[in-house]
Design a protein with these regions (language model features):
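N-terminal small-domain helix-loop-helix segment of the aminotransferase-like
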Residues: 2-88, 95, 268, 369-370
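PLP-dependent enzyme catalytic core of the Aspartate aminotransferase-like
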Residues: 77, 108, 148, 324-333, ...
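Conserved PLP-anchoring active-site segment centered on the Schiff-base-forming lysine
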Residues: 81, 99-121, 134
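A short helix->loop->beta-strand "cap" motif at the edges of active sites that frequently abuts
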Residues: 105, 126, 181-184, 210
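Active-site phosphate-binding strand-loop segment of PLP-dependent enzymes
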Residues: 135-197
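Active-site PLP attachment segment
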Residues: 207-241
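Structural signature of PLP-dependent enzymes
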Residues: 243-247, 265-288
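Conserved glycine-rich beta-strand-loop-beta hairpin in the small C-terminal domain of fold type I
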Residues: 263, 279-288, 299-312
């Protein structure tokens, strides 16, 4: 299968390790195991004693009951047996496409978005239609445009973007009605779900639509990207059977240690979420103040998530801007051209506060040389 290079991941692979100020990171400030046990109040010594005595088999092939039950509680209507474990959310998205999409199927995706959501179906041979989100519309989908792209042959509609836009329950409901009219699946990458700037329940697509497919992981909301634990949740039995069948070919199980640690975090999801909501809210205030103080930069203020798409008014391509800034100051952001958004950069603002402040100061310093 021929597939386009994954622009954002190639960028991260090449430059992340040597960054002095990593404000390209999209996870909420990652936790160590020591921090996890401290946050949750679980006994580290008891856990290690019990785990170290276990034989390292494949473990529960479908994931432990504790893990799947913990994930199901993140939704209103999902049951434990409606959760399929995967290798991270990236693995989940890939798994969904390879299980459900065939050459010739129509897939409607949006842009800017995570490149998986259009490059994988395109590589499979699907007919991929792109709806471009507009800054003047706060990066929210235009329902009339979406209707014009969705045909009777549409197999799937994909929702996700890196701008921090937040779709209301009413807007999601309208998208559901469009999908239901042609029997299409809706794949919603929900890795940032509940990382909002206001205290409100964020609806999941699976609680609104019988053919909704939710993808998520332990990486962003739970600050545990090192576990590589993700999942697919759906009520659709035919889709779930396809996921499990394909899973036998490429996963088998998720690993006993990952399962055990993820189960701890999920048991205390309220504590983990409270910590991370505090971080994204306090840090976005810092980024927003920086935007106000630097007239060469502008953005649509995020309402959710951990990233912001920040535009600049310098006459310089985003790859050149970001490379020069990286080499001259050590500040590391993601070029907007990775998302086909020229003259912009994606800033991850959920890192530790000192990295964020120092990174933004480095951007200011670099901008002064242009």
């Amino acid at each position: 299968m021929n597939i386009k290079p994954f622009a954002v991941e190639e960028w991260m692979n090449e430059y992340e390790v040597g960054a002095l100020y990593n404000i390209a990171e999209t996870c909420v400030d990652s936790v160590s195991l020591d921090e996890l046990f401290e946050l949750t109040g679980e006994n580290k010594e008891d856990f290690l004693k019990d785990f170290c005595a276990q034989r390292l088999t494949y473990g529960d092939i479908w994931g432990s009951e504790a893990l799947r039950s913990g994930i199901s509680k993140l939704y209103h209507t999902i049951k434990a047996d409606e959760v399929v474990l995967t290798h991270g959310a990236a693995g989940a998205n890939h798994h969904v496409f390879c299980s459900l999409i065939s050459a010739g199927d129509r897939v409607v995706s949006i842009m800017p978005t995570y490149q998986q959501l259009y490059s994988i179906p395109e590589a499979i041979g699907a007919d991929v239609a792109i709806m471009h989100l507009k800054q003047e519309n706060d990066y929210l989908p235009d329902l009339n445009e979406l209707k014009s792209l969705v045909t009777p042959e549409t197999k799937m509609i994909c929702i996700n973007n890196p701008t921090g836009a937040l779709m209301s329950k009413e807007l999601l409901g309208s998208i559901v009605e469009i999908a239901r009219g042609v029997g299409a699946y809706i794949l919603c990458d929900e890795v940032y779900r509940h990382l909002t700037q206001e205290d409100e329940w964020c609806e999941s697509i699976v609680d609104l639509y019988e053919k909704g497919i939710s993808v998520s992981s332990m990486s962003k909301v739970f600050s545990l990207a090192g576990l590589r634990m993700g999942w697919i949740a759906t009520h659709d039995e035919a889709a779930r059977k396809a996921f499990l069948s394909h899973r036998d070919y490429n996963l088998i199980s998720c690993g006993m240690f990952d399962d055990a640690i993820a189960s701890i975090a999920l048991r205390h999801s309220d504590v983990m979420l409270k910590r991370n909501q505090r971080i994204v809210r306090e840090n976005l205030a810092i980024l927003d103040d920086w935007i106000k103080e630097n007239p060469h930069f502008f953005y649509t203020k995020p309402k959710a998530g951990t990233t912001a798409l920040v535009y600049y008014d310098f006459d310089i391509p985003s790859y050149e801007f970001c490379k020069r800034m990286y080499h001259e100051t050590g500040a590391f952001v993601t070029p907007g051209d990775c998302f086909e958004q020229p003259h912009s950069m994606r800033v991850g603002y959920a890192c530790d506060v000192n990295t964020l402040r120092d990174g933004l100061a480095a951007v200011t310093k670099f901008a002064a040389t242009l």
